[in-house]
């Protein structure tokens, strides 16, 4: 099992939740999926049927449709953060937080938008 910061004696203020997980916060819901397809070899090329990817969805207030306060920080300017202009302008986040690899940002944004419309989020 991967060690957590507290296991390495890195100090944090406060007390851990029961599971030391984001889902210890009341109302937070998390879902994820991972796609592992094919085998990588030295001969794997662009035409191969090979994938290692995934996405994590975090609903800060579960299925409640109210916004949460939000802020952001760019560590090094790499990667994509869809929706940052709204966070900068309003200080709020309305909807799920989606975590994926840079190459999947577009399709994840599209799927999230469709999910939000379908669920009237």
What is the predicted function of each stretch?
Residues 1-121:
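Alpha/propeptide regions of enzymes that mature by internal proteolysis
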């Amino acid at each position: 099992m991967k060690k957590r910061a507290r296991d390495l004696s890195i100090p944090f203020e406060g007390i851990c939740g029961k599971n030391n997980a984001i889902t210890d916060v009341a109302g937070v819901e998390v879902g994820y999926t991972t796609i592992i397809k094919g085998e990588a070899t030295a001969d794997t090329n662009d035409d191969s049927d090979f994938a290692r990817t995934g996405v994590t969805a975090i609903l800060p207030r579960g299925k409640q449709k109210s916004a949460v306060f939000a802020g952001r920080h760019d560590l090094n300017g790499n990667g994509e953060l869809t929706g940052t202009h709204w966070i900068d302008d309003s200080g709020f986040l309305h909807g799920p937080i989606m975590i994926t690899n840079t190459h999947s940002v577009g399709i994840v944004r599209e799927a999230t938008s469709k999910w939000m419309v379908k669920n009237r989020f």
